[in-house]
Design a protein with these regions (language model features):
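C-terminal catalytic domains of large/alpha subunits in multi-subunit enzymes
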Residues: 1-94
Length: 94
């Protein structure tokens, strides 16, 4: 979810050094309703030390979604979040 937000919706905007988004009223974060049903399977392996499993996939989310957009419509996006307006602009640039 966190990586999805970084890639698609979350952005703090600035103008002339001033923060335009000063509260969370307009800061859109992903909703659970956006996701398909996820089944979590935990595997007990006492020989393996405990470690985090949620953080590493966050790093790849932007690239994964950018490449999916490129494969779907041929628009190469290099800035996050990847909004519909940025996709349209990339399509116009060719």
């Amino acid at each position: 979810m966190m990586g999805l937000g970084y890639a698609l919706t979350e952005e703090v905007r600035f103008k002339d050094g001033e923060v335009l988004d000063r509260n969370f009223d307009s800061y859109q974060i992903p909703r659970f309703s956006w996701l398909p049903k996820i089944e979590t399977v935990l595997i007990d392996n006492p020989d393996t030390p405990a470690q985090g499993c949620g953080e590493p996939p966050i790093v790849t989310m932007g690239a994964v979604i950018a490449n999916a957009i490129y494969d779907a419509v041929g628009a190469r996006l290099l800035q996050l979040p990847m909004t519909p307006a940025r996709i349209q602009a990339a399509l116009k640039r060719g």
